[in-house]
Amino acid sequence: MWKGKTRGGVSGYLFFIYLIRYCGVKAAYGFLSLIVLYFIPFAPKATKSIWQYARRILKRNRIQSVGLLLNNYYRLGQILIDKVAIGNGMIDKYHFKFNHYQEFLNVLDGDQGVIMIGAHVGSWEIGTPFFNDYSKKMNVVMYDAEHQKIKEILKKNGQQQPYKIIPVNEDNLAHIFKITEALDHKEYVCFQGDRYLNADKLLTCKFMGHEAHFPIGPFLLASRMKVPVVFYFAMREAKQTYHFHFILAEQVSGSKEKRAEQLLLEQYVNALEKIIGQYPEPVSYTHLRAHETLANL
């Protein structure tokens, strides 16, 4: 189970920030290609899970699985580099495509707060420049350990966060009140719907043919608050292109057979499966969620 921390030290992130700023994006890609082998032995759990995914789910042979492993780490590194580059004003070096963008903006312009639920595929932060003034009303819910690391990186790099953070700490429920307050003020609250800290507060749903666990929080809040819900994915394509997918969730009403939060989760999983079908690589945490037991076989 994920512990709310993102791989990579602050010094490593800062190195890439300076490399991109003074040598350019292509230089960062080049350096990444030299160090991608590092991740295979030094990220053993991820390596084993990706290998099992390639062999047992995608049915790749050994040579193809090695290629997928190397390509996977390289492409994940590219996404991190892109995130830093765009955050440092290099947006003109990238191309962007959108699905249902105007419908999404219409929801944001409505008379209610909005809940946005993403996943750990692609890179949701890439979309920040397109939100413009909407960013002032965005509240990103993230675990406190990750929040502290991002704060340190931004402070050392002299940058400001374009959106607000609601840190989640297992020891108290302060984040619940902040989320409710943000929605009451017609602001937007952004979650990742595929990771959890508390194994006691989960929903179960069939995902890619396997039973998988998801955090109950985003789906319970969305169903209780009766606000619009948008599923949001920003996916990397060829030639430094990012494709934004906005899926407006249908309103749900629970019953004795199935609660409202479960119905909303099923909509989310359906959207997520379609995205993964379109973008089978790089293999992310989300791809492995339904197959997490494979690493223990």
Cite the ranges covered by each PLM segment.
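A cross-family acyltransferase "interaction/gating" segment
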Residues: 146-155, 195, 199-263, 267
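Membrane-anchoring hydrophobic helices of lipid-metabolizing enzymes
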Residues: 1-118, 151-155
